[in-house]
């Protein structure tokens, strides 16, 4: 899979990176690089992000257990269970984040 880039600046959420939930085993790397001061968390959804009715605001988002609320530094995590979408939620600060999402096996 081609690496996907996500970004936030100020209090915002990134676009959604699509994940292939049919791959076994699931192995997704999420690397978040922080510039300046920002607080963020990595979130994932099981909702159908390709549905015509999908909106980020109406989707059910779960915090990644390792990079849950309150992260402030450059970090990475793995997702090893089926998900359909991944995003970054910047909850505080005027800084920014640049994130790379890479899924192995496809």
PLM region spans:
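Acidic/polar N-terminal loop/beta-strand segments that form early-domain functional surfaces
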Residues: 33, 45-47, 59, 91
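Beta-sandwich interaction modules
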Residues: 6-23, 60-106
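Extended, low-complexity, turn-rich repeat/linker tracts enriched in Gly/Pro/Ser/Thr and Asp/Glu
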Residues: 31-40, 92-98
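Structural beta-strand segments of beta-rich domains
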Residues: 24-30
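Short, surface-exposed beta-strand/strand-loop-strand elements in extracellular ectodomains
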Residues: 37-56, 100-105
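Surface-exposed loop/edge segments in extracytoplasmic proteins
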Residues: 2-5, 49-64
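Residues that flank catalytic or metal-binding motifs in active/ligand-binding sites
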Residues: 26, 38, 84
């Amino acid at each position: 899979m081609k690496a996907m880039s996500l970004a936030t600046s100020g209090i915002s959420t990134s676009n959604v990176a699509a994940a292939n939930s049919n791959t076994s085993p699931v192995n997704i790397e999420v690397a978040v690089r922080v510039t300046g001061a920002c607080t963020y968390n990595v979130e994932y959804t099981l909702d159908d992000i390709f549905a015509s009715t999908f909106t980020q605001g109406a989707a059910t988002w779960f915090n990644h257990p390792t990079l849950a609320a309150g992260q402030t530094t450059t970090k990475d995590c793995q997702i090893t269970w089926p998900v359909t979408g991944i995003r970054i939620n910047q909850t505080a600060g005027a800084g920014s984040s640049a994130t790379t999402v890479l899924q192995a096996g496809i």
